[in-house]
Each structure stands twice: as structure tokens, then as C-alpha cells.
């Protein structure tokens, strides 16, 4: 029983005496490791961010081209006001001259043929 207690006390004293020495070294090592981690993150960020910005620019460019050429931008649907000189109604629709007299009916609208 006494040898167990003595062994425990010896191991305990060795652990306590070596503990503070490790604590003095660990903060410096931890600072170095965190600095290395930050350097790796900055390096990765410098590689990824320009590629993401380039990809975003390409997507925005494609989106703007698509919206310019979309049918809704080029054509006008049924019941929508149109210009008599430049009728851009959908296929199957025409832009006839207004038939009813009145203030509200003086503009041209796209109607079915």
C-alpha cells in the first residue's frame, strides 16, 4: 500500500515540476502556429478571391447579354401599348389603328389577328 502511495507521489511531483516548463514553451509555439495558419489563410485567399471575382464578372456579363436578348425585352404582349411606326408585338399579334373614339383609346395596342 505504501509503495503505491509513494509511486503516486513521485509521479505527481514529476508531472507538477514538468508542467510549468511546458506552459512557458507552449505560448510561443502556439503563436508561431497561429501565425503560420494566418499566413496559409492569406495565401489561400489571395489565390481564390481573384478567381471568384473573374467568375462573378463572367456571370454578370452573361446575365446582361441574356436580359438584352430575351423575348420579353424585344417583343410586346397582347393588350400592351405599342408604337404605330415600330410595332414589336409577339408573333400572331398586330398593332392596329384604334377604332373607338375617345381620349383613352388614342394609343395603339397589340391585339390578336
UniProtKB/Swiss-Prot annotation:
Where would one find the signal peptide in this protein?
A: 1-21
For this UniProt record, the keywords arranged alphabetically read as follows: Disulfide bond, Ion channel impairing toxin, Knottin, Secreted, Signal, Toxin
Q: Which residues form the propeptide?
A: 22-74
Q: Which GO terms describe its molecular function?
A: ion channel regulator activity; toxin activity
Its annotated compartments are: Secreted
Q: Which family does it belong to?
A: Belongs to the neurotoxin 14 (magi-1) family. 01 (HNTX-16) subfamily.
- Tell what the record comments on domains: The presence of a 'disulfide through disulfide knot' structurally defines this protein as a knottin.
What is the official name of this protein in its record?
A: U11-theraphotoxin-Hhn1l
Q: Origin organism of this chain?
A: Cyriopagopus hainanus
Taxonomic placement = Eukaryota, Metazoa, Ecdysozoa, Arthropoda, Chelicerata
Amino acid at each position: 500500500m505504501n509503495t503505491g502511495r509513494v509511486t503516486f507521489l513521485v509521479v505527481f511531483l514529476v508531472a507538477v515540476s514538468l508542467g510549468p516548463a511546458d506552459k512557458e514553451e507552449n505560448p510561443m509555439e502556439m503563436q508561431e502556429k497561429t501565425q503560420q495558419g494566418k499566413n496559409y489563410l492569406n495565401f489561400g485567399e489571395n489565390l481564390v478571391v481573384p478567381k471568384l471575382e473573374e467568375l462573378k464578372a463572367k456571370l454578370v456579363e452573361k446575365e446582361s447579354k441574356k436580359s438584352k436578348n430575351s423575348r420579353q425585352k424585344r417583343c410586346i404582349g397582347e393588350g400592351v401599348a405599342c408604337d404605330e411606326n415600330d410595332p414589336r408585338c409577339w408573333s400572331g399579334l398586330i398593332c392596329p389603328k384604334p377604332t373607338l373614339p375617345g381620349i383613352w383609346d388614342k394609343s395603339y395596342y397589340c391585339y390578336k389577328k
